Amino acid sequence: MPRRAILACLFSLLALGLTGRTVDASPGDDSLSFLYTASKNYEPLAWMHGAERFSSGATVFVLDVHGQHALVADFAASADPAVSFDGQRLLFAGKQSAQDSWQVWEIALAGGKPLRITSCPEDCIRPLYLPEDRIVYARKVGGHFLVESAPLSGGKPLPLTYGPANALPTDVLRDGRILFESEFASESQTVPEIYTVYSDGSGVESYRCDHGKVRHSAKQSGSGDIILVSDGGLARFTSARAQQLPISAPAGEYAGDIAETPQGSWLLSWRSDADSKFQLMFWTPGAANLHPVLANAGLNLIQPVLLVQRPIPNRHPSGLHDWPNANLLCLNAYTSKQSFAAGSIRSVRLYTRDDTGEARLLGTAPVEEDGSFFVQVTNEQPLQVELLDAAGRTLKREAGYFWMRRGEQRVCVGCHAGPETAPENAVPMTLLKSTTPADMTGKTAQSAAGGH
């Protein structure tokens, strides 16, 4: 994409103040219109402990062929811009006055007053458009961020995450799943990780299982790859590989949230080191150099979003049943990142968390010789799996938690098997013995034998 249109916009900034005006979307490849967020202080991982990412406030700006201006000049703060699929409307998180909590707002590109979408006692941030006039965003409840969706026109919100970890949506994938960042806990550390969930809250899973790296601020590119920040640099997930792949980009630190132009180049936030401010740069993947677009010595310039139309993601028809609980079928617990001796796994325990955050046992069920088990679990609560040997000793216990929606029926290839693993073409022994799941809903903490 030619940079002359960008430069023309930049030169015109000197003559412009922060006044409201109509925004022009990019009509083609000969111009570049975009939004970005400016903030003195930016902590991209503050959400992990329910804290403020913009401790000194933030402002969303528009840069188009007319110049630059604040998106909503009369707001005390604005951030997290997102463009509708038709390119005609914008979502953003905003505060009308400094003492307000963050709320989700929508404004038309053609002009007019912003419309408040949420009324959250605490903050609602990071909004994104979903198909069928719905949105997804993060809501803070008791100092903890959870992801939920709601109709644009108002109505009852639907929680999508039910674990104890904080979570923040970052993109809506073309297949309809919601990409979000949350915490991954291991025995030694807790790091941000990339996850997906369907728009009804079912099917939650980590995007890749090579955990341990600091990963956040992920977006889907035109190729279908997921572009993310990993330990300050850029990396990607691609369908052909089960592990993260590095992106050979110019040295420095990246803020993520890339914006890809129709020609495949990236508008992104970069800084030379941790003591510098993020500035907007233009980069063609594979090129040796970044090209400056916009910088401010006292502000971080982040969250670039192009003002362009884009395809509507696939709609997700929910497969949830009208059942009071959920069913979980594991085909083979030996299929795992962890190595288990043949015949060593004899039973499985399931835990949730009580009101104080302590683990509470829901029940114990047998594991068959082929590693299969079939259990009915409590829904919309944190769940944690523990595998035991014949003496009741722990072989492996999850450090984190997952969840299942009411009426969800889920089949797992194994225990933390990874997306590259396919199941054996065989009926699991647990179903040959009984199609009745073992009761692990917490009605009792006794051993649950199901149909055995």
Task: Walk through the language-model features, giving the residues of each.
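Long, low-complexity, intrinsically disordered segments
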Residues: 449-452
